[in-house]
């Protein structure tokens, strides 16, 4: 078993796609596996992905060919693709905290916001593989433009990208944080990992924003519970690394707004 934590800037550019293929090729070489024994490489990316057709409709859609086919030609192996949150959901179902439950919702709170759904032990993909775009439910009456091109999406006020934006706005408006001096230097862009670290160092401003995000996400999770009646809801993704700072507000909102 070989695991590698590789720095990679995930952007919707041809250069980023080429970089990804190079990283995967290097990884397969370092793994020292006989190429003839590699049956398939599964690549999980964010956005709208149809795992059956191999098309990605949000990222790396520069060719008329399916992204899976483009990647296979560049890497030299058979490739399948899927949405990252759905893959995380399946991972939890097979090897994670699931203990026999067959109806599950996995909430991925990272830079974006998505969910994976398992119904009767099967991952639900929807007709075109676009299920789980939780972050793009229209919730807020705001003028914040989401990266999807629409306004009012849940993700605009309840996600890692929202945390990043709100924190910068509040620090620039004079509020204090242990990240204030870091932002004032204006060197490299502030990362989500740095904000998570500040939360876990008990930075009050960062904690306050995370708790507000937890309340908003929890209210919408309550709606999902009312719709799907799952046996288990799992909170994952980058923001879950803040622990109780995000999970407790989520639980409070779920208790307040859900029927079960």
Segments the model singles out, each with a brief description of its role:
Residues 46-49, 110-112, 239:
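Short glycine-rich anion-binding loops that position phosphate/pyrophosphate groups of nucleotides
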Residues 98-158:
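Glycine-rich phosphate-binding loop of actin/hexokinase-like ATP-binding domains
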Residues 3-103, 245-255:
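Glycine-rich phosphate-binding loop and adjoining helix at the ATP-binding site
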Residues 83-85, 129, 212:
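Short beta->alpha linker loops
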Residues 1-37, 75, 141-145, 150, ...:
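ATP-binding/phosphotransfer module of carbohydrate and carboxylate kinases, centering on a glycine-rich
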Residues 53-54, 121, 129, 174:
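Detector for glycine-centered tight turns/loop "hinges" at secondary-structure junctions
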């Amino acid at each position: 078993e070989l695991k590698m934590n590789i720095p990679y800037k995930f952007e919707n550019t041809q250069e980023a796609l080429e970089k990804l293929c190079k990283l995967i090729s290097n990884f397969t070489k370092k793994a020292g596996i006989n190429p003839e024994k590699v049956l398939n490489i599964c690549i999980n990316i964010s956005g709208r992905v149809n795992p059956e057709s191999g098309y990605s409709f949000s990222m790396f859609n520069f060719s008329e060919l399916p992204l899976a086919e483009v990647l296979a030609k560049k890497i030299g192996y058979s490739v399948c693709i899927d949405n990252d949150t759905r893959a995380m959901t399946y991972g939890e179902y097979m090897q994670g905290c699931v203990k026999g439950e067959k109806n599950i919702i996995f909430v991925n709170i990272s830079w974006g916001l998505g969910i994976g759904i398992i119904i009767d032990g099967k991952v639900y993909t929807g007709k075109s593989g676009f299920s789980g775009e939780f972050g793009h439910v229209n919730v807020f009456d705001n003028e914040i433009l989401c990266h999807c091109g629409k306004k009012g999406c849940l993700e605009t006020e309840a996600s890692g990208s929202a945390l990043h934006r709100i924190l910068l706005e509040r620090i620039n408006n004079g509020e204090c944080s242990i990240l204030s001096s870091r932002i004032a230097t204006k060197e490299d862009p502030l990362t989500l990992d740095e904000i998570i670290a500040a939360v876990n160092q008990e930075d009050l401003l960062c904690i306050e924003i995370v708790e507000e995000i937890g309340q908003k996400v929890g209210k919408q999770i309550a709606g999902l519970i009312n719709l799907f009646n799952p046996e288990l809801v799992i909170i994952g993704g980058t923001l879950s690394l803040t622990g109780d700072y995000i999970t407790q507000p989520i639980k409070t909102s779920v208790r307040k707004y859900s029927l079960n």
